[in-house]
């Protein structure tokens, strides 16, 4: 890839963002008010990424680019499917964490993408049994501002992208890639 291709960051006509996040493509849905809109934009992102891979393969003259919707490279690296919510600042952060942490941990039982094997940043990939979540091996703490090391279930970076006096950003980085809309 050229320097320009590695640093590309596009805002798409549907309001989504498509960019290179370190070594892999990342698609961020536009802001959505309804669950059905999130699902539609998630599926649109799959199609956009697939078309980009097809174009790249055509330009390279063969099937050099492979596309996977996952949360791990099976070499000890993980990337999350993030949720971001605009939340009223009048709700105490301690109330959010007390109510959300048990739900977020148990959500992986229902919505986890699953994988075979165990891995971590230090240990790499070890073949093994089936797990319900691809991301769980990499979560290390309940709350933290970090996203690359000491990964939290609930990220505390407060970037609301709105009126800071009224709102906070609830940034969840525990999620697995969505495989099913149900």
Task: Report residues per predicted region.
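Histidine-centered divalent-metal-coordination microenvironment in nucleic-acid enzymes
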Residues: 71-88
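Inter-helical turn/loop segments and adjacent helix faces that build the functional surface
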Residues: 90-96
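Terminal catalytic/cofactor-binding subdomain
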Residues: 1-68, 77, 98-118, 124-131, ...
């Amino acid at each position: 890839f050229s320097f320009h291709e590695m640093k590309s960051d596009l805002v798409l006509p549907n309001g989504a963002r498509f960019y290179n996040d370190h070594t892999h493509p990342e698609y961020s849905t536009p802001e959505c008010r309804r669950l059905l809109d999130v699902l539609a934009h998630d599926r649109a992102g799959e199609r956009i990424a697939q078309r980009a891979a097809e174009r790249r393969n055509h330009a390279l003259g063969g099937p050099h680019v492979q596309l996977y919707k996952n949360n791990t490279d099976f070499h000890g690296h993980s990337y999350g499917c993030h949720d971001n919510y605009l939340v009223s600042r009048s709700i105490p952060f301690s109330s959010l964490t007390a109510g959300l942490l048990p739900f977020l941990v148990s959500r992986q039982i229902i919505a986890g993408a699953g994988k075979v094997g165990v891995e971590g940043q230090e240990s790499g990939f070890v073949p093994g049994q089936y797990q319900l979540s691809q991301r769980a091996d990499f979560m290390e703490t309940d709350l933290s501002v970090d996203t690359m090391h000491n990964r939290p279930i609930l990220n505390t970076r407060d970037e609301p992208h709105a009126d800071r006096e009224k709102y906070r950003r609830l940034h969840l980085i525990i999620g697995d890639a969505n495989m099913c809309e149900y």
